[in-house]
UniProtKB/Swiss-Prot annotation:
Positions with a binding annotation for ATP: 53, 66, 419
Organism: Saccharomonospora viridis (strain ATCC 15386 / DSM 43017 / JCM 3036 / CCUG 5913 / NBRC 12207 / NCIMB 9602 / P101) (Thermoactinomyces viridis)
Catalytic-site annotation from UniProt: 57
Functional description taken from the UniProt entry: Catalyzes the covalent attachment of the prokaryotic ubiquitin-like protein modifier Pup to the proteasomal substrate proteins, thereby targeting them for proteasomal degradation. This tagging system is termed pupylation. The ligation reaction involves the side-chain carboxylate of the C-terminal glutamate of Pup and the side-chain amino group of a substrate lysine.
Keyword Ligase appears in the UniProt entry: yes
Protein known as: Pup--protein ligase
Pathway: Protein degradation; proteasomal Pup-dependent pathway; Protein modification; protein pupylation
Misc. remarks from the entry: The reaction mechanism probably proceeds via the activation of Pup by phosphorylation of its C-terminal glutamate, which is then subject to nucleophilic attack by the substrate lysine, resulting in an isopeptide bond and the release of phosphate as a good leaving group.
A Pfam family recorded for this sequence: Pup_ligase
Length: 452
């Protein structure tokens, strides 16, 4: 599949403090955040005019699901637009709090763990064809996803009984199964629940829930782009060395705790391999695969970054990736802060810095401050992100949904939408079923919009 549909769902951590003390419960904060949404959408689960879905997930976590994208840079832009949309809600909620005499600062964190040890996710979605054996996709992908944190982790200062440890991944400590149909109860690496949100005879939706939420645009690009390339190779019948892991859950934690990438993990046949070895195998195949075609500049950059990230780990010199890969950017930040103030990794101020990296409020969040200083590389720009807050991707089904929502809202009409249905809640209950996620032009939708 040369052209693929991608989407990212991100759950955000939320808290409200007043002079450093917790002010409101997460439930109360979430209610303030979503008050504006509920006032126009009559629900805390809505689709927006840019084709995305915004809702309150289990445990009072705001969640943003991007519209269907068919281009990696487009996906990065729409993922960032979600941050800006939630930042707007945050600013509005703080204003309401002030009007009601409740002082306080609301924080939204694009991370995966809170101080109490709870975890919330970043789920990636990939459209795959129904043809072929899905179990083979899972078998080939699992070792790749377990080791991908080496190049895509968000980084985390983990507090252990032996003191603070710098880890590659936030999510690794919270994954309990390899492949499963549940997402919250068991937290697998690949979710197999078959909900394609498309023509079920032609497509499946691969739902990957092991990844970290990323702040750095190049890391998001590499995270999704590398999976896309591995899927392409599986679809084309490329054979990979067998890296089936003896215990994927133990392996994912062991790899996260080892910045050298050299720690050996047990494979199913009794052999051992390191995360670096496993990633090198997938990377080498990806290079061959890409060079056999006519790669776009984005794909060329992706392959270059992937290779540089592996080289940086192998050489233990992260300076070549510490403006592009989240865990390396944060590692540089933490190490400079520690040496300046003579701190250990167990110091609460280091934990505070770790958290502040993921604060999405511009002008306050540490990642944004680094970006303003030109210390992190961009894939998109602020103008594109601003546009994506209101406009859907123009090349996928999201355009149909976004255009319908915008037109219905402008006409003051009552409507219901989901990923595949567009429905006018009038006497006729007119509904259009959009089963092809690649289709951005549909006469039935045009007729529905023209009838408003």
């Amino acid at each position: 599949m040369q052209r693929r549909i991608f989407g990212i769902e991100t759950e955000f951590g939320v808290t409200c403090t007043f002079h450093g003390q917790r002010r409101l419960s997460p439930d109360e904060v979430a209610r303030y955040l979503f008050r504006r949404v509920v006032s126009w959408g009559r629900s805390s689960n809505v689709f927006l005019s840019n084709g995305s879905r915004l809702y309150l997930d289990v445990g009072s976590h705001p969640e943003y699901a991007t519209a269907e994208c068919d281009d990696l840079a487009q996906l990065v832009t729409h993922d960032k637009a979600g941050e800006r949309i939630l930042e707007d809600l945050l600013i509005d909620a703080e204003r309401r709090l002030a009007e009601e005499g409740i002082g306080g600062d609301i924080f939204l964190f694009k991370n995966n763990t809170d101080s109490a040890g709870n975890s919330y996710g970043c789920h990636e979605n990939y459209l795959v064809t129904r043809a072929g054996e899905f179990s083979r996709v899972a078998d080939v992908l699992l070792p790749f996803l377990v080791t991908r944190q080496l190049v895509c982790g968000a980084g985390k200062v983990l507090q252990t009984p032996r003191g603070g440890v710098y880890c590659l991944s936030q999510r690794a400590e919270h994954i309990w199964e390899g492949v499963s149909s549940a997402t919250t109860r068991s937290r697998p690496i690949i979710n197999t629940r078959d909900e394609p949100h498309a023509d079920a005879e032609r497509y499946r939706r691969l739902h990957v829930i092991v990844g970290d939420s990323n702040m750095a645009e190049p890391t998001t690009l590499l995270k999704v782009g590398s999976v896309h390339l591995v899927l392409q190779m599986i679809e084309e019948g490329v054979q990979f060395r067998d890296f089936t892991l003896d215990n994927p859950i133990r392996a994912i934690r062991e790899i996260s705790h080892d910045l050298t990438g050299r720690r050996q993990v047990r494979l199913a046949g009794g052999r051992e391999a390191s995360a670096l070895e496993i990633q090198r195998e997938y990377y080498a195949r990806a290079v061959q695969h890409v060079e056999s075609g006519d790669p776009s500049p984005t794909t060329q950059y992706l392959i270059d970054l992937w290779g540089r990230a592996l080289d940086a780990v192998e050489q233990q010199d992260f300076s070549s990736i510490d403006t592009e890969i989240d865990w390396a950017i944060k590692h540089r930040l933490v190490e400079r802060y520690r040496s300046k103030h003579n701190l250990t990794l167990s110091d609460p101020r280091v934990a505070q810095l770790d958290l502040a990296y993921h604060d999405i409020r511009r002008g306050r969040g540490v990642f944004d401050l680094l970006q303003r200083k030109g210390m992190v590389r961009r894939i998109t720009d602020d103008g594109e992100i601003e546009l994506a807050k209101d406009s859907p991707p123009q090349t996928t089904r999201a355009k149909l949904r976004g255009d319908f929502i915008a037109a219905a809202q402008e006409a003051g009409r009552d409507f219901t939408v989901d990923w595949v249905h567009l429905k006018l809640n009038d006497q006729a209950q007119r509904t259009v079923l959009c089963k092809d996620p690649f289709r951005s032009v549909d006469e039935r939708v045009e007729r529905l919009i023209n009838s408003l």
